[in-house]
A protein has these predicted regions:
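Secretory targeting and sorting signals
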Residues: 1-27
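Generic alpha-helical propensity signal that fires on short helical segments
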Residues: 19, 23-24, 120-122, 166
């Protein structure tokens, strides 16, 4: 498992340009970046969400669109830190069903910890920054470079917000592919 996670980490590092030949100056440790990370919702999750009447909508400059029978969203990369192996994003997504809503914003991909965090607020209250997903090796490369599985916190917030018992820790939520050199 450790070997697999190291392979995933290296694939993500290379894809976002954090591993490069040569050396940089001290001020190059944190950089402003262009590009985006594409997140594709797992088809089974998309079916569950839409079947429950939950509507997703992009926030603050994110883009959402149909993709291979499911939904994809692009979140702008705003910078990265070599020291903390963190990729920062702006934008977010809201999930709404009737009066119930949850907003997830300003994602950080933390490669060192293998987690994706975001700022959460909505019907459950203003929670602040929490770990939302665990980064795992993708089992569906056509949807994304890495698989995102729910943390217990994220699953609990989704279940509490929508009054369901459909989300569980370690369940696949979707797939992600950072595209740091692509136009948003």
């Amino acid at each position: 498992m450790r070997r697999t996670m190291m392979a995933v980490l290296m694939a993500v590092l290379v894809s976002v340009g954090l591993v490069a030949a040569g050396t940089g100056t001290a001020e190059a440790k944190t950089r402003k970046q262009v590009g985006y990370t594409q997140v594709v919702v797992a088809p089974a999750v998309y079916d569950l969400v839409t079947g429950a009447g939950i509507s997703p909508a992009p926030l603050d400059g994110a883009k959402a669109y149909p993709y291979k029978g499911t939904l994809a969203a692009n979140f702008p990369i705003t910078g990265y830190s070599l020291g903390s192996l963190r990729i920062k994003h702006s934008g977010g997504i809201s999930l709404t069903a009737g009066a119930a809503t949850i907003e997830l914003r300003n994602f950080y991909i933390d490669l060192g910890r293998g987690r994706v965090s975001g700022v959460v607020n909505g019907t459950v209250g203003n929670v602040g920054r929490v770990d939302l997903f665990k980064i795992r090796f993708s089992d569906n490369a056509r949807l994304g470079l890495v698989k995102l599985t729910l943390t217990d916190t994220a699953a609990g917030a989704l279940n509490a917000t929508f009054g369901v018992n459909a989300f569980a820790e370690n369940a696949t939520f979707g797939y992600a592919t950072p595209r740091p050199f692509s136009r948003f």
